[in-house]
C-alpha cells in the first residue's frame, strides 16, 4: 500500500484541476490521478460549477484521420513529441503543457476554432503509445501528419496540400466572412 503524503495529494489535485480547467472528462481524471472518484467529483463541481458530463468517451482512431481533425491532431502531436524530446516533461505533464500550447496556437489565429478536446488529445497519445497511430511525412510540404499505423503511406499527401472539395466551408467561416462584410 502506498503511503499518501500531503504534498503528493496536493500534486494530484493540481493535475486534476489543470485537466478539469482544460475540459477533461472524469474518466481521464481517474486514469491520470490517484484521487478517488468522490474527490474528483467534488473537485470537478468546485472548479467548473457543474457536474461532469456522462456517457461514453470518444474512442475512435478514425476521427483523427478526417480532414480538419487531422490537421489539429497533427499540430498537437508535433507539440507533444517536441515537449517529450526537448522540454524534459513526460506523462500527464507533457499532455497538459502540449495542449495549452496547442490552444495558444489555434486561438492566436483570427477565427481559429479549437477542434481537438483535451480528452481526444489524451486518447491520441494513448493510441500512439499503443502503436495504433503514427506521424508520417507529407511528400509535398514535409510536414508530419497523424495516420493509422498499418496503412500504406507511399507518396502520402496531407490534407493541407490536397484539401477535400468541401474543406473550409464551415458555418464558423461563413459567420467570420459575414462579420467582415458588414
UniProtKB/Swiss-Prot annotation:
InterPro entries in UniProt: FlhC (IPR007944)
Binding locations of Zn(2+): 138, 141, 158, 161
GO cellular component, one term: cytoplasm
GO MF terms held by the record: DNA binding; zinc ion binding
Biological process per Gene Ontology, one example term: bacterial-type flagellum organization
Keywords (A to Z) from UniProt: Activator, Bacterial flagellum biogenesis, Cytoplasm, DNA-binding, Metal-binding, Transcription, Transcription regulation, Zinc
Co-factor note (free text): Binds 1 zinc ion per subunit.
Protein localization: Cytoplasm
Major place of residence: cytoplasm
Cofactor(s) the record lists: Zn(2+)
Database matches in Pfam families: FlhC
NCBIfam families in UniProt: PRK12722.1 (NF009365)
Subunit structure comment from the entry: Heterohexamer composed of two FlhC and four FlhD subunits. Each FlhC binds a FlhD dimer, forming a heterotrimer, and a hexamer assembles by dimerization of two heterotrimers.
Entry similarity comment: Belongs to the FlhC family.
Its job: Functions in complex with FlhD as a master transcriptional regulator that regulates transcription of several flagellar and non-flagellar operons by binding to their promoter region. Activates expression of class 2 flagellar genes, including fliA, which is a flagellum-specific sigma factor that turns on the class 3 genes. Also regulates genes whose products function in a variety of physiological pathways.
Protein name: Flagellar transcriptional regulator FlhC
Organism phylogeny: Bacteria, Pseudomonadati, Pseudomonadota, Betaproteobacteria, Nitrosomonadales
Amino acid at each position: 500500500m502506498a503511503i499518501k503524503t500531503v504534498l503528493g495529494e496536493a500534486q494530484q489535485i493540481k493535475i486534476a484541476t489543470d485537466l478539469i480547467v482544460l475540459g477533461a472528462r472524469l474518466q481521464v481524471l481517474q486514469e491520470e490521478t490517484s484521487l478517488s472518484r468522490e474527490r474528483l467529483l467534488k473537485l470537478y463541481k468546485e472548479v467548473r460549477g457543474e457536474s461532469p458530463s456522462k456517457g461514453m468517451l470518444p474512442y475512435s482512431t478514425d476521427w483523427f484521420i478526417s480532414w480538419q481533425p487531422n490537421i489539429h491532431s497533427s499540430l498537437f502531436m508535433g507539440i507533444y513529441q517536441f515537449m517529450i524530446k526537448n522540454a524534459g516533461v513526460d506523462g500527464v505533464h507533457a499532455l497538459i503543457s502540449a495542449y495549452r500550447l496547442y490552444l495558444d496556437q489555434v486561438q492566436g489565429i483570427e477565427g481559429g476554432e479549437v477542434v481537438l478536446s483535451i480528452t481526444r488529445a489524451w486518447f491520441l497519445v494513448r493510441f500512439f503509445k499503443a502503436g495504433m497511430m503514427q506521424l508520417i511525412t507529407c511528400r509535398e510540404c514535409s510536414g508530419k501528419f497523424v495516420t493509422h499505423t498499418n496503412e500504406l503511406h507511399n507518396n502520402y499527401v496531407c490534407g493541407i496540400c490536397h484539401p477535400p472539395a468541401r474543406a473550409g466551408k464551415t458555418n464558423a467561416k461563413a459567420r467570420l466572412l459575414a462579420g467582415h462584410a458588414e
